[in-house]
Amino acid sequence: MTNFQRIGSISNAHIGRDFEVIAYAHFIDLGYDIIKDVGLSVGHERKKNHRFDLGTPLNAEEKIIIECKSHRWTRPSDNVPSAKLTVWNETMNYFHLAPEGYRKILFVLRDFSVKRNETLGEYYIRTYGHLIPKDVEIMEYDEVNQSVRVL
């Protein structure tokens, strides 16, 4: 059986939670009132609750929802992690269906491919840009420099 867990990690769930902590700290440092696990009713005519990784409390004046993705190029060949990018596409759909008035942020890990000469976030925008709602911001976290840039 092949193990698709990231090398050096306890589990992929731990990786995701650790990355959410980084995103949470980033937005708190910027002065935003951010909480974890924000539930919103999403959908067209029929609605269903969806839990976003981070966001502002429901009664906040400035409304923000954030989804965090710490995916990397598939190792060792820097192949496209196609299955993982379908999760990014699903996130775009949830952002599209979210209530109006929310600032929508996809917070991703910067992973640069020398083979492709671009980050996974840049690749996603280039390849799937037609699926990204115009009001979604994609922010890329560089774990080496501990910095964030808007793509």
How would you describe each model-predicted region?
Residues M1-V42:
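Acidic-basic catalytic patches of nuclease active cores, encompassing PD-(D/E)XK
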Residues H14, D18, I22, N49, ...:
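Short, well-structured alpha-helical interface segments that form or flank functional binding sites
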Residues H14, D18, R103, Y123-L151:
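Charged, structured surface patches that assemble and position nucleic-acid processing machinery
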Residues L30, P57, L97-G101, L131:
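Alpha-helix C-cap/termination motif
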Residues V38-L40, F107-F112, E140-V144:
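Acidic carboxylate-rich catalytic motifs and surrounding loops in phosphoryl-/glycosyl-chemistry enzymes
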Residues V38-T56:
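N-terminal interaction modules that seed assembly of large macromolecular complexes
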Residues F52-S70:
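Active-site beta-strand-loop-beta-strand hairpin of nuclease catalytic cores
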Residues C68-T127:
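Catalytic cores of nucleic-acid endonucleases
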